[in-house]
Structures are given as structure tokens and as C-alpha cells.
UniProtKB/Swiss-Prot annotation:
Plays an important role in the de novo pathway of purine nucleotide biosynthesis. Catalyzes the first committed step in the biosynthesis of AMP from IMP. InterPro entries: Adenylosuccin_syn_GTP-bd, Adenylosuccin_syn_Lys_AS, Adenylosuccinate_synth_dom1, Adenylosuccinate_synth_dom2, Adenylosuccinate_synth_dom3, Adenylosuccinate_synthetase, P-loop_NTPase. This is Adenylosuccinate synthetase. Pfam families: Adenylsucc_synt. PANTHER family: ADENYLOSUCCINATE SYNTHETASE. The keyword Metal-binding applies.
Length: 429
């Protein structure tokens, strides 16, 4: 049995798609277990860029199956749009498998997300307004519509009718918005269910059987640890558990199944939306990093907030996700810089701390304590091994690993799959 999980070590957008695509070429199965179409990932294949939000990155390379687990919330329109695009580009999509227990993002969930965010005014949290939060709310309230419900016409109609009664009360009486009509939703979504049927199975059984048979299974995390609903910068977080524990519940398997948990990070830090960000750069250095790395959201197109590497946040991610291997991306961005800074601790009310505070008020008062390292002039995008990198780049990598307390397993020096330096094969235990 070989089970490797890839989780975001920062606030998402760390480049998980690239490393999962790289690792999936040796996997029989690639599994996604949380989030929805709020979690974009970009894959470069032979110079062609694919931007996806729902389909697992492993669709390109995993030999047996690319799996959407029960913890994922699915927007059928988005999913079929991605499938159509893949098929037009010659990608085989027949190996997609969808959990019969996954929840469906309904039109009223998208509307509720939009109305709630609008009503918050200045207190908005920066949601993508894709209906992710309300769908997880429906799930927790036990009124959610699952994939298996879409396949049963009578069940689907009954649940939809009841849910619309509840949602329309909210829309008309609280938000002053128009009610939604059953006939505008039912036929379209039932048809989605029929189109989805050929992909649907009990993915918990599928994945656990593969592990029992000694197959290599890759688990793709979505978003990042600092967006986890319990361990992140609450309330500026997503609606699901993005840590490694969420992978287990989001596919239906025991925690003892995971052998390796790889934490993916950038050589700096980014964040989209509102919320505390201790190392944020609001100067020309931040602009330079953003422009060099094209730091704009895959889903929203919004400019990402940019900051120096934060080892305090990554140590927090290591602890709560059990990270035992580090995958660092976008090292090439710092070619031509004079210096690089790493946050080693915070200063809170005159005291040095090395933990990540739960209190937002404390976080906003935290000042980063920096260590400065020299950068390098050389173009490193053709580097194939660690020794090909300039001495200063190697020193930076060693210091990151030392501060986080986790060995590096891969280093990315460019966007293409092959621009990856492997220090340790994650599939080898």
C-alpha cells in the first residue's frame, strides 16, 4: 500500500496542481476529497495550459481512475464544462469516478452565497460566491442533495420541493429577493444526474480496495491549511477541512491509511480575499513578485496578496496536517532579486512568539520577525538537480527546511511538469 497526500501548506494557490500532476504519473489512482469549484488549479501539459476547478489533476496521468470523493461539493455545470474542454483537447475522461455520497451545489446555494455576502457589507469574508458555503450548510443541516438523489427522480423532486420552500422564505422575507421556481431547476438537474450516472460509484470502496491491493493512490487536497475551517484564520476560511484529516473523512477511509503527507508551499506567500496576513508586502517588492509569478486567482482572476515566506504559518500547517515532506514551488521567481526575507517568528505586543494565534485581534497585532538571505542572479529554470542551483538558492532551501522542521522532497523551478527537482521520491517509504 502506498498512499501519498498532497495538502496546501499556506492559503491555497501553492501549486498543488503541478505536484499532483507530477506524482500522478506513477499513481494508479488520484483522489480529490474536499472543496468545490472555488479551488482552481492550473496544469501545464506539453506547453498547453489547463485551468480546472473540479476535475482532479490526476485525470491527465493516473492510470486507473481520477476520483471525486464524498467530501467534494459538485457544480454539475462547471464539471461538465471542464470535461468537454478536456475531451476537445484529446484527454481521456472515461476514468473519472464520482462518489454517490458527494453533495450537489444547487442554484439556490449560489444565490444564497451571493445574497449573504452582499448583506454583510464591510464585514464580507471574500467568498467566491460559487455556493460552496451554503452547500456545506445544507449538508450539516441534513437537507443537502447528494449525487445519489439526482439519480432517483422521485427522491430528487421531493427534496428539491422541500428545499425551495425553505430557501424561498429566506430569499423573499430576509433578503427581499425573488423566489426560485422548481420547474426552472428540476429537469435541468435531473438531466445532469443522468449524464453523471456512468461515472458514479461508491468511491470509498473503490479507493480502499485499491489500497488493499497495494496500489499507489494519490490524494489531492484543495485550498490550503490556513483556510481550514477549524485550523485556519477563522472566519476568513473556506467551508471544509483542508488538512490531511479532511482527506480521510472526504473519501471514507481510516487515518492510518496515509503514509506520506506532502505540504506544498511557495518560496514566498500569497493569499486571496480578506483576512490577516502578517508578512504581506504592500510595496514595489510585492508588486514585482506578483507580476513575475503572474499571481492572479485561477477562479476569480483577482490579484493575489503577496508576502515573504512565513515559517510560523507553515510550522502550524506541519503540526495540524502531519506534514512529513515539503514541496516548494516558484523558486525561480527570485532570480535577479538582491535579497529574500523569511519570517522566523512574530512579535506580539513586544514579545517574540513562534506559534500562530487563534485570535484575529492578536494576529492583526503580530509583526513579522525577519531573517534576510542573499538571492541570486542566475536563471534556474533549466536546473535538473539540487547541485545545478546557485549556492544562495541552496542555502535558502536548506533554511526553509530547517525552520519548518520538514525535509524537502521536490523543488519547482518552472511551470512545466519536467521543471521539478526531486530530492526524495515520495512513493518510496
Amino acid at each position: 500500500m502506498a498512499a501519498v497526500a498532497v495538502v496546501g501548506g499556506q492559503w491555497g494557490d501553492e501549486g498543488k496542481g503541478k505536484i499532483t500532476d507530477f506524482l500522478s504519473k506513477d499513481a494508479t489512482m488520484a483522489v480529490r476529497s474536499n472543496g468545490g469549484n472555488n479551488a482552481g488549479h492550473t496544469i501545464d501539459i506539453d506547453g498547453k495550459e489547463f485551468k480546472m476547478r473540479l476535475i482532479p489533476s490526476g485525470i491527465f496521468a493516473a492510470s486507473k481512475a481520477a476520483v471525486i470523493g464524498n467530501g467534494v461539493v459538485i457544480n454539475p455545470e462547471v464539471m461538465f464544462g471542464e470535461l468537454d474542454n478536456l475531451e476537445k483537447n484529446g484527454i481521456d475522461t472515461s476514468k473519472l469516478r464520482i462518489s454517490n455520497r458527494a453533495h450537489i451545489i444547487m442554484p439556490y446555494d449560489v444565490k444564497q452565497d451571493e445574497y449573504q455576502e452582499e448583506a454583510k457589507g464591510d464585514r464580507k469574508i471574500g467568498t467566491t460566491k460559487n455556493g460552496i458555503g451554503p452547500t456545506y450548510m445544507d449538508k450539516a443541516s441534513r437537507i443537502g442533495i447528494r449525487v445519489c438523489d439526482l439519480l432517483e427522480k422521485d427522491t430528487f423532486e421531493e427534496k428539491l420541493r422541500l428545499n425551495l420552500k425553505v430557501k424561498n422564505e429566506l430569499f423573499t422575507k430576509v433578503y427581499g429577493k425573488p423566489a426560485l421556481k422548481l420547474e426552472d431547476i428540476f429537469d435541468k438537474y435531473y438531466e445532469y444526474g443522468q449524464k453523471m450516472k456512468k461515472y458514479v460509484t461508491d468511491t470509498s470502496v473503490l479507493v480502499n480496495d485499491a489500497l488493499d491491493n497495494g496500489e499507489k493512490v494519490l490524494f489531492e487536497g484543495a485550498q490550503g491549511t490556513m483556510l481550514d475551517i477549524d485550523e485556519g484564520t477563522y472566519p476568513y476560511v473556506t467551508s471544509s477541512n483542508t488538512i490531511s484529516g479532511g482527506i480521510c473523512s472526504g473519501i471514507g477511509m481510516g487515518a492510518n491509511r496515509l503514509n506520506t503527507v506532502i505540504g506544498v508551499c511557495k518560496a514566498y506567500t500569497t493569499r486571496v480575499g480578506e483576512g490577516p496576513f502578517p508578512t504581506e508586502l504592500l510595496d514595489e517588492v510585492g508588486d514585482r513578485i506578483r507580476d513575475t509569478a503572474h499571481e492572479y486567482g485561477t477562479v476569480t482572476g483577482r490579484p493575489r496578496r503577496v508576502g515573504w515566506f512565513d515559517s510560523v504559518a507553515l510550522r502550524h500547517a506541519k503540526r495540524v496536517s502531519g506534514i512529513n515532506g515539503l514541496s516548494l514551488n516558484l523558486l525561480d521567481v527570485f532570480s535577479g532579486f538582491d535579497k529574500i526575507k523569511i519570517c522566523t517568528a512574530y512579535e506580539l505586543d513586544g514579545k517574540k512568539i513562534e506559534y500562530y494565534p487563534a485570535s484575529l485581534k492578536e494576529l492583526y497585532r503580530c509583526k513579522p520577525v525577519y531573517e534576510e538571505l542573499p538571492a541570486w542572479e542566475e536563471d534556474i529554470t533549466a536546473a535538473k538537480k539540487l547541485d545545478d542551483l546557485p549556492e544562495n538558492a541552496q542555502k535558502f532551501l536548506n533554511r526553509v527546511s530547517e525552520l519548518v522542521g520538514v525535509p524537502l522532497v521536490t523543488v519547482s523551478v518552472g511551470p512545466d511538469r519536467e521543471q521539478t527537482i526531486v530530492l526524495k521520491n515520495p512513493w518510496e517509504r
